[in-house]
Amino acid sequence: MTEQANNGGAASQNEQGAQFSLQRIYVRDLSFEAPKSPEIFRQEWNPSVALDLNTKQKQLESDFYEVVLTLSVTVKTGEEVAFIAEVQQAGIFLIKGLEAAAMSHTLGAFCPNILFPYAREALDSLVTRGSFPALMLAPVNFDALYAQEMARMQSAGEAPATAH
């Protein structure tokens, strides 16, 4: 009987405290271009890879946020563009009960960290369907990127963007 009462009390406290829940993960946009195919397949494969990543977030309604992670990859062999691939991997998250700094970190680092493996897999699948070797992108440290961006904004005298 005591255990049941304690469990019920803990659930009530948890409901009143911070909450985080992944609601949905989806591909928002996906594109692939191989402007020099099929000629590029006959060249020696010595690629240079340029990766750009970006995150953005917006509040959908009270306590629900959309976070979009965009990965854009341009692969060249010599001066020729072999392919350009881009994915916008998005997620809807229920987030409530966080202070402003924790909310900013959650939206700017924690959520993109959840989305990255899905975006990486989508890019690899897209690239291999274009008959190129898989990219096998290395993991990204979104906490470090977030800290760098916050330091840059602080030195520039900018206020951190919020999704509210």
Curated annotation (Swiss-Prot):
Recorded GO MF terms: unfolded protein binding
Keyword Phosphoprotein: no
Cellular component GO terms held in the UniProt record: cytoplasm
Keyword Transport: yes
Predominant localisation class: cytoplasm
Function text: One of the proteins required for the normal export of preproteins out of the cell cytoplasm. It is a molecular chaperone that binds to a subset of precursor proteins, maintaining them in a translocation-competent state. It also specifically binds to its receptor SecA.
Cellular localization per UniProt: Cytoplasm
Highest taxon in the source lineage: Bacteria
Keywords tagged on the record: Chaperone, Cytoplasm, Protein transport, Translocation, Transport
Entry's Gene Ontology BP terms: protein folding; protein tetramerization; protein transport
Taxonomic lineage of the native organism: Bacteria, Pseudomonadati, Pseudomonadota, Gammaproteobacteria, Pseudomonadales
PANTHER family: PROTEIN-EXPORT PROTEIN SECB, PTHR36918
Oligomeric form and interacting partners: Homotetramer, a dimer of dimers. One homotetramer interacts with 1 SecA dimer.
SUPFAM superfamilies to which the protein is assigned, alphabetical: SecB-like
Name the UniProt record assigns to this protein: Protein-export protein SecB
Record-stated family: Belongs to the SecB family.
Native species: Stutzerimonas stutzeri (strain A1501)
